[in-house]
Amino acid sequence: RLSLTPWPSKKKVRVDLTVYANYAGAYTPTRPLFNVVVSTVDPSSLEPDFLETIFHEGSHLLFRYEGKWRESIFQTFEAGSYQMKFPRHLWHVSLFYLCGQVCKEEFAQIGIKEYEMVLLTRNIFKSYQSDELFAVLNQYMQNGHTLSATTEQLLGVLESKTNN
């Protein structure tokens, strides 16, 4: 629902569990085939954030190239007159945050109240992180904004950080 891209009905997703899966412990090549690769010896594989990692990596299929989320960022940026470089990781930090927040809410329902999302525990895309950016994504999650309005607000937050 959050990506606005339906799961492909005839697409199989291969998941490979391996000892080493790069510096991050997981990755997802999306071209030519979609494949999730996850390390089983990464320290996080024994923690609840392992589930978030699987969810995040699988969600790359929904936040893929030419997907609605990435296209919205690109089109909004191109149509605007932003005084900053194109934020090429905005789609990915959004994916991290949305997956992390969904997992946090689901974990809370089963009694895991102190869960902190991978984006924060591993300081991923730290330069993008801000309370303002997270507030915009939270509003989007609560159906408070359309994707285009969310994209405009996200770019506005990043531009104000750049110019301060």
Task: Outline where the language-model segments fall.
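Secondary-structure boundary elements
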Residues: R1-K12, H56, H60, V102-E106
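Auxiliary, metal-adjacent structural segments of Zn-dependent hydrolase domains
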Residues: R1-P29, W91
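Short acidic alpha-helical/loop segments enriched in Asp/Glu that coordinate divalent cations
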Residues: S9-V15, R64-T76, A108-Y115
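Active-site recognition of the HExxH zinc-binding catalytic motif
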Residues: P48-G67
